[in-house]
């Protein structure tokens, strides 16, 4: 067992040594990468941003500040004018859209409810209260009388089946049955 423990310790020591070497290599690579990025940043700034040239006297610096303030004021005025134009045009667009909807009649209509109305009430609503129109649709129909057929008469004669059963139940009912047969 002692031999195996020594081997395990040697393996773990070797692993730790390899990890530390790998971390050192990675750290140097990161430093090189940061240095390269900083150099790229300096090159980009040198190409795209001209160096600042400061005039020597205080009067020249004040003059430069006045010029810059004048440019800022001009830019602000243009910005304000553009905002006003945009607001006007958007308001005109809204008004034109509203007129377009008015002309088309595309208002949101409320849902209609179903109302039961007789023909007389409908005509009264359409024509007004001055005109009196009676639309009794049943008046024009033919009247048909129902003729009794033989089957219907027989059914009426039989009557309610409960009555027949009650009459035939008991001794008197059976007596009547025998008397009627003979």
UniProtKB/Swiss-Prot annotation:
List N-acetylglycine occurrences by residue: 2
Phosphoprotein as a keyword?
A: yes
Q: Which residues carry this modification: Phosphoserine?
A: 118
Residue segments, region Involved in binding TNC and actin: 97-117
Keywords of the record: Acetylation, Actin-binding, Muscle protein, Phosphoprotein
Carries keyword Phosphoprotein?
A: yes
Molecular function (GO) terms listed? actin binding; troponin T binding
Annotated region (Involved in binding TNC) at 2-48
Which sequence positions carry the modification called Phosphothreonine? 12
For this protein, the record's Gene3D superfamilies field holds: 1.20.5.350, 6.10.250.180
What Gene Ontology terms for biological process does this UniProt record contain?
cardiac muscle contraction; skeletal muscle contraction
Sorted alphabetically, the Gene Ontology cellular component annotations on this record are: troponin complex
Leader sequence segment: none
Function, as annotated, reads: Troponin I is the inhibitory subunit of troponin, the thin filament regulatory complex which confers calcium-sensitivity to striated muscle actomyosin ATPase activity.
Subunit architecture? Binds to actin and tropomyosin.
- Family of the protein in this entry: Belongs to the troponin I family.
Record-given protein name: Troponin I, fast skeletal muscle
Give the originating organism.
Oryctolagus cuniculus (Rabbit)
């Amino acid at each position: 067992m002692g031999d195996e423990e020594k081997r395990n310790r040697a393996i773990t020591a070797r692993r730790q040594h390899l990890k530390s070497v790998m971390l050192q290599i990675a750290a140097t690579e990161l430093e090189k990468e940061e240095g390269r990025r900083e150099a790229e940043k300096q090159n980009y700034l040198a190409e795209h941003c001209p160096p600042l040239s400061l005039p020597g006297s205080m009067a020249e610096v004040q003059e430069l500040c006045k010029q810059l303030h004048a440019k800022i004021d001009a830019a602000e005025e243009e910005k304000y004018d553009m905002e006003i134009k945009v607001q006007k045009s958007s308001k005109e667009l809204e008004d034109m859209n509203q007129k377009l909807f008015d002309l088309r009649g595309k208002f949101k209509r409320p849902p209609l409810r179903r109302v039961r109305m007789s023909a007389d009430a409908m005509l009264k609503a359409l024509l007004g209260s001055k005109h009196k129109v009676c639309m009794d649709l049943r008046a024009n129909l033919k009247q048909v009388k129902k003729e009794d057929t033989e089957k219907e008469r027989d059914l009426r004669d039989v009557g309610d089946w409960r009555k027949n059963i009650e009459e035939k139940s008991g001794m008197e009912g059976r007596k009547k049955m025998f008397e009627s047969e003979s």
